Amino acid sequence: MFHCIPLWRCNRHVETIDKRHCSLVYVPEEIYRYARSLEELLLDANQLRELPEQFFQLVKLRKLGLSDNEIQRLPPEIANFMQLVELDVSRNDIPEIPESISFCKALQIADFSGNPLTRLPESFPELQNLTCLSVNDISLQSLPENIGNLIYTACFQNKMPL
C-alpha cells in the first residue's frame, strides 16, 4: 500500500538549481516551489525566449545565470530581485535594460555582454555596490558616469571610446 507523503514533509528548502545545457524552451514549473529558499538559479545555455511573470517571485535569488539563451526582454519586474548579487544575461537578444534594475541594490557583478544594447539605463549609477560590469561585444555609445564602485569593467571590442 502506498501513502502520500504530507506536503509539510517534502524538502522545500533548495538553495541551488542548475539547469544549464538542458535544451529548455521555458522555465520549468518545479522551480517555483522553491521560491522561499532558492538563492542560485543557473539556466545558462538553453533556448529560453522569455521570463514569465511568476519567475520574478523568486525574490531570494542572489545569483542568476541566464547567459546563452534567446531572451528578448528583461522585464521591469527585475526590480523584485533586491537580494541579487550576480546577474549574467550575456549572449541573449536583450535590446535594453529596464530602469527598474536600480532596485537591485545588492548587485555587485553584472554581465550584459553580447546583447544588442546601445545604452545603459539612466538609473544605473544607483547601483552603488556594483564592482564588476561586463559589456563586451555590444554597441554602447557611452557609459554613465559614477557607476557604482567599479573595480573591473570589461568593455573590449565595443564600438565606443573607452
Predicted ranges, named:
Residues 1-162:
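The feature captures the LRR N-terminal capping module
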